[in-house]
Regions:
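Short Lys/Arg-enriched alpha/beta "domain-start" segment
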Residues: 1-34, 78-134
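Amphipathic, interaction-prone secondary-structure segments
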Residues: 23-51, 137-162
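Intrinsically disordered, low-complexity regulatory segments enriched in Ser/Thr/Pro
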Residues: 44-73, 161-186
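Conserved binding-pocket/active-site segment within a compact domain
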Residues: 121-181
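Sequence-level detector for tyrosine residue identity
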Residues: 4, 18, 35-37, 45, ...
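Ampiphathic alpha-helical segments that act as solvent-exposed interaction surfaces
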Residues: 64-89, 176-209
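Domain-length accessory/inserted modules outside core catalytic folds
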Residues: 102-103, 107-112, 141-142, 180-183, ...
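Short linear sequence motifs
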Residues: 8-11, 62, 69, 85, ...
């Protein structure tokens, strides 16, 4: 078993130590006796209330897949560790400006964003279509810009500029100023990584049609 799987299993056990009824009230979660349900980047997940295991489905759980590390760790962190009175500020900030940490992988000029920008370069139509498939709301500025739901209670903005003769492709992510009330700084990396993965999946589907 990989270190990632070990950590995920540890967190599933950790999840069971928390008050699930409080989670339900806090985030208005759909639930039944066996599961809690939550949407994460327009995909429905369920958390087993006895084992803590997280799975997702696109067919109302007739079939299901295990959540990967980024997905599971983000959901666990939000449900278990968000501040009691977390709330959106309704004010966008650059993800690299999160106040508690300077630099790191979420800095605007990090390899993380440069590499993602390269993948989108020359594919603005596909990127826009992917954002629309994820029910994004079109925004101003940038060659492509959309507000997307990370969670129903926590949107983000994806903004992209294509490369030209003077500048490389540029990807910018804006988050709510209070995002760290919902998750740890390190978890933001997992969440945005999953967001970009979902956008990439929808781009691939569009190009294959």
């Amino acid at each position: 078993m990989s270190n990632y799987e070990t950590m995920k299993d540890r967190m599933s056990s950790h999840f069971l130590e928390y008050d699930q009824e409080k989670m339900i009230r806090k985030f208005a979660l759909e639930h039944d006796e066996k599961y809690l349900y939550i949407f994460f980047v327009e995909r429905k997940y369920r958390i087993n209330r006895i084992t803590g295991e997280i799975t997702w489905s696109v067919d109302k759980f007739q079939t299901e897949e295990n959540a990967n590390y980024n997905e599971a760790m983000t959901i666990y962190d939000v449900l278990c560790n968000s501040k009691e009175y977390c709330h959106p500020a309704h004010e966008w900030v650059h993800i690299g400006s999160l106040s508690t940490v300077q630099g790191g992988n979420l800095a605007n000029d990090s390899n993380f964003f440069r590499d993602a920008g390269k993948k989108f370069d020359g594919k603005t139509a596909e990127l826009a279509k992917a954002c629309e498939r994820l029910h994004g709301i079109k925004m101003e500025k940038g060659d492509v810009a959309y507000q997307l739901e990370l969670f129903s209670f926590l949107p983000v903005v994806l903004r992209f500029w294509e490369s030209d003769d003077e500048f490389p492709a540029s990807l910018q992510v804006l988050v709510d100023r209070n995002i760290l009330e919902y998750m740890h700084y390190e978890t933001v990396m997992f969440a945005i990584g999953h967001l970009l993965e979902r956008v990439g999946e929808e781009m691939e589907r569009f190009m294959q049609e």
